[in-house]
């Protein structure tokens, strides 16, 4: 596993341990690896807690040590059973609140339901609902990483520190891709062009954007709402009004804006889940002359058949961080590589507990990062 260790963090972390408790809210042992890494870096023991499912599938949490007057950090990595994971977190937060914890900080590297942060058709903004539930349960602070949309921070009425994984991914490119200076950074849709531009500018590389039929459906901003069918006897609008309507969208044939011929193509995005759009992008880049294709993403959800499809595709390597456990997927697909980001989460916890500034973790980060 690739790990970045800045020189200033190589020594043992200076942390006041007396008032800090570190919990993992996961009942699934495979989801506790990140928590263990963070605890080891901080030099503290994991707090004693039992999280389990009753025979009737209800979640039960039993905290087995005092949290009164302490800073409680609850680490929750998202498993495949996302709804159970959320309930585990909410119940543990509420248990700490009713046990008189001084502060309750959620460490949620991948914020669930973040894709549902926009209104579509007659749906709802689920990430806003989840933010309200967390605050109501008793969360006083949130540490997360690379939110799908930065505006999600505004859904909370508590402080939110949205850390970035890009420094770790950039260093991976520089150290693990020998000929990276012959690479081009690729956005698989116009929606991810800003992220690609940020990577390209920092690596002093060119950029290419894929536009057309291979676009991800999320880039379509149409909300999709339609009125109920008209009653024939009732006019839709007053006959004297002429309201202009939007012309329907029509995606052009697939196009790559930028030169990728004879180069390494590095596709960057924040989430890799359903891989169809990545596979289509890889095929297009191969047709345009790219001789090697990498995919870099912060959150590797890699749902359903994603590992098998990646293994059979034109993609040479997929690099994701360990915000979400994916050890099983790595066994299915050797092309998947992991970058460890426990270092930055540990440092964020240390700084918040010690009352230090968080600005060090956000230096050189712009609005588009």
Curated annotation (Swiss-Prot):
Keywords: Acetylation, Nucleotide biosynthesis, Phosphoprotein
Modified residues (Phosphothreonine): 5
Recorded superkingdom: Eukaryota
Keyword flag tRNA processing: no
CDD domains in the cross-refs: PRTases_typeI
Family listed: Belongs to the ribose-phosphate pyrophosphokinase family.
Protein name (database record): Phosphoribosyl pyrophosphate synthase-associated protein 2
Organism of derivation: Pongo abelii
Lineage: Eukaryota, Metazoa, Chordata, Craniata, Vertebrata
Gene (name only): PRPSAP2
